[in-house]
């Protein structure tokens, strides 16, 4: 099969496009012919050796996908359209085929394209787990979402609005219209404004940026507030205050959460993100764009 893979850690240039062996399914697995795979920060962090989970070389990256079952199992039959999120550090979705456990695969909604399903799988899953399971965001609360134009943050903005929260987000000025359309009540230009000077006493923060943004965000929480970060490594950072909580979402890859993501989109509670597509053979260029961290929405690789 054709795939994009890397034989060593490094920059985007280490990604190769070529032939790899077809996957051999194990017990409880199905084989999926991938039509689309999305690009996530986790992909280039793994390629750069920054992810924490060791991989064997050559390694196929890619965490989420959408496609058609070619070898069925107990829950899915040949020809079923499905989408899902891969397990780390197993082989990923930058390939024409993947063998994957059935419990982490869900049926693709008929009114969504493969590119759209690939775009919402991991981003939506992360947002749902972060807001509903980890932060337990409630109606009437105020949340600050960092990096609002990104895939996870964009889904989180829309979900928070759907849950009845007041939503503040940070984004470049050029993306303010975009994040407002997603549901943000207020947008702050992080390039010209220090958010700690204009935000205070919020109930929750979702940090998708990391670095000093994480630690500075503790300043704007109310007493008893909570911060969830998906950008600070495998564990939550120690809070800079004793009266707030620091949390690290445990993003569970399972069918119920994938079905929740799909339902939010198909029921129009959450809009689809802006999508930029690249052919699978141009995954290296997609990684360069993703690493630039100025993307609006999601990058998707066309596999078929």
Can you annotate each of these PLM segments?
Residues 269-273, 287-304:
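C-terminal capping/lid region of NAD(P)-dependent oxidoreductase domains
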Residues 197-204:
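A short acidic, Gly/Pro-enriched loop at the edge of an enzyme's catalytic core
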């Amino acid at each position: 099969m054709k795939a994009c893979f890397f034989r060593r850690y490094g920059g985007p240039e280490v990604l190769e496009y070529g032939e790899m062996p077809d996957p051999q399914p194990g017990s409880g697995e199905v084989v999926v012919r991938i039509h689309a795979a999305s690009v996530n920060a986790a992909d280039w962090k793994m390629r750069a050796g920054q992810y924490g989970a060791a991989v064997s070389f050559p390694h196929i990256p890619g965490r989420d996908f959408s496609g058609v079952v070619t070898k069925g199992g107990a829950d899915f039959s040949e020809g079923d359209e499905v989408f899902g999120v891969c397990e780390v550090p197993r082989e990923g979705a930058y390939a024409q085929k993947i063998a994957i456990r059935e419990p982490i695969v869900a049926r693709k909604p008929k009114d969504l394209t493969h590119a759209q399903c690939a775009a919402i799988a991991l981003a939506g899953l992360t947002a749902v787990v972060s807001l509903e399971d980890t932060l337990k965001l409630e109606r009437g609360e105020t949340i600050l979402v960092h990096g609002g134009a990104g895939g996870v943050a964009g889904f989180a903005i829309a979900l928070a609005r759907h849950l009845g929260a007041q939503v503040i987000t940070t984004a470049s000025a050029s993306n303010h219209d975009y994040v407002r359309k997603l549901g943000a009540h207020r947008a702050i230009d992080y390039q010209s404004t220090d958010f700690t000077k204009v935000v205070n006493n919020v109930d929750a923060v979702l940090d998708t940026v990391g670095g000093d943004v994480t630690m500075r965000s503790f300043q704007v929480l109310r007493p008893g507030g909570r911060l969830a970060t998906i950008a600070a490594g495998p564990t939550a950072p120690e809070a800079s205050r004793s009266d707030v909580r620091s949390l690290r979402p445990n993003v569970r890859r399972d069918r119920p959460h994938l079905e929740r993501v799909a339902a939010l989109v198909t029921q129009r509670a959450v809009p689809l993100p802006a999508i930029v597509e690249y052919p699978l053979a141009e995954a290296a260029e997609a990684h360069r764009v993703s690493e630039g961290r100025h993307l609006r929405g999601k990058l998707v690789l066309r596999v078929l």
